[in-house]
């Protein structure tokens, strides 16, 4: 679940994307892009209260290895409040920028 005032921080978009609709759009596009990418979370750090997590992931798309981190904050209702994505290496970041942009355009209809 996503909070109405949630914020998404993309590794390639310079301004935070605010609002449930935009956060949902970015997460949905990522789900489509990573769908067949052998995506896996390989490590996690969760705070004692359980409302913040850093999740390291790996994937591979078009022969390019992707390593990244999702930093997620949940509000007191258990809804996503803040979602930040970091990606490396640069080759993977550039490829994801292209694929995410295309997917978001496709989803607009």
Show the residue positions of the predicted features:
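A solvent-exposed, acidic/Ser-Thr-rich amphipathic alpha-helical stretch
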Residues: 4-50
